[in-house]
Regions:
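Extracellular attachment/recognition segments
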Residues: 1-92
Length: 92
């Protein structure tokens, strides 16, 4: 059985905006991962990186409630990394 590891990589508060990221290093073929903004912040934009040539992004978009960024990817059944990041700003 494959263990899925998801973690927040970093969160830095820099002059009114925050960068957040999540990483999945599992061996799952079909993955959905979200980078979630801190409370009282909304997502301004987001993105991703993948580490395998055969992995494909099928979805990259903000969450409907504005609380983060979601990416869906499909890749091989061996280890590859999906990283999702988001830029969050003060909710005003």
């Amino acid at each position: 059985m494959t263990e899925r590891q998801v973690q927040r990589v970093s969160q830095e508060d820099l002059g009114g905006w925050t960068y957040v990221a999540a990483v999945d290093d599992s061996e799952e073929e079909d993955r959905t991962l979200e980078a979630i903004c801190p409370v009282d912040r909304v997502v301004l934009g987001g993105g991703f990186s993948i580490t395998h040539d055969e992995a494909r992004i099928t979805q990259s978009l903000p969450l409907k409630d504005g609380s983060g960024w979601r990416v869906r990817a499909i890749g091989p059944d061996n280890a590859w990394r999906l990283r999702v990041n988001a830029i969050c700003v003060d909710e005003r």
